[in-house]
């Protein structure tokens, strides 16, 4: 397994709920402020230093590449943020349409409301202060970095498994892979929702749960209750559920 669980329950975080790139139509354009990511942990806990939410490419053009930081939200530093009294923190954009519980911490405008389209992997990680060399990016000069960076390629040999130099140094607490319908796709998390698997090559861990959503592009995903595992699909003890979002 590529998932490395945190050293203590109090430090463990989970991606509890996520909605990426709501669909649009000619009469109902996509609203950037409708995207959301909810994180779950211990009630009132302060998130440890070196904790990040990251996006990792899952398409065949740049598999394993870390998405850019900044307003796009590809790399979000969660260090020092405090979870609400119900143990949750939600990432939203100003003008969002949601009513949020007063017991939930709200983190606004750390993305531009334009999370990557469904062909990405989302992870909660802690770097433990450990540096990992990047691929040098456009300069070709590798740099050792203790924080995730867009020059980091988590899968340099493109085999669908996060390279050991990252899993040995960093803790991957939780993750989800969301795939569309490219001919070759890369899924690095232990739960994968794919629009279709028919005629596709999906490079992944052999232990991962793969859900084929029957040619429907799921955009909303959530953990069931206080689940901590990676079962999904039509099973009685599922940990994850997903669904489509109407465009109007």
Q: What role is predicted for each listed range?
A:
Residues 1-12:
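Sec-dependent, cleavable N-terminal signal peptides
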Residues 10-198:
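Activation on beta-sandwich/Ig-like modules and their edge loops
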Residues 185-219, 228-229, 242:
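Extended, solvent-exposed regions of the mature portions of secreted/cell-surface glycoproteins
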Residues 221-223:
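Broad, structure-driven detector of short, well-ordered beta-strand segments within folded domains
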Residues 225-248:
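A recurrent domain-boundary module in secreted/ectodomain proteins
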């Amino acid at each position: 397994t590529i998932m490395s669980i945190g050293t203590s329950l109090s430090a463990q975080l989970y991606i509890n709920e996520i909605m990426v790139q709501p669909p649009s139509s000619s009469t109902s354009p996509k609203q950037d402020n409708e995207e959301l990511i909810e994180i779950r942990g211990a009630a009132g806990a302060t998130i440890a230093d070196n904790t990040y939410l990251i996006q990792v490419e899952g398409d065949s053009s740049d598999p394993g590449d870390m998405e850019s930081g900044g307003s796009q939200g590809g790399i979000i530093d969660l260090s020092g943020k405090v979870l609400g009294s119900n143990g949750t923190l939600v990432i939203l954009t100003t003008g969002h349409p949601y009513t949020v519980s007063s017991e939930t911490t709200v983190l606004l405008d750390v993305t531009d409301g334009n999370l990557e389209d469904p062909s990405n992997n989302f992870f909660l990680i802690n770097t433990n202060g450990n540096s990992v060399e990047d691929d040098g990016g456009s300069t070709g000069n590798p740099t050792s970095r203790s924080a995730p960076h867009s020059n980091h390629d988590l899968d340099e040999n493109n085999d669908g498994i996060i390279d050991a130099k990252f899993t040995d140094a960093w803790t991957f607490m939780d993750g989800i892979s969301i795939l569309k319908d490219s001919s070759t796709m890369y899924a690095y998390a232990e739960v994968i929702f794919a629009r279709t698997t028919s005629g596709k090559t999906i490079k992944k861990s052999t232990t991962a749960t793969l859900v084929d959503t029957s040619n429907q592009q799921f955009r909303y995903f959530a953990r069931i209750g206080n689940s901590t595992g990676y079962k999904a699909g039509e099973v009685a003890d599922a940990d994850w559920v997903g669904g489509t979002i109407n465009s109007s």
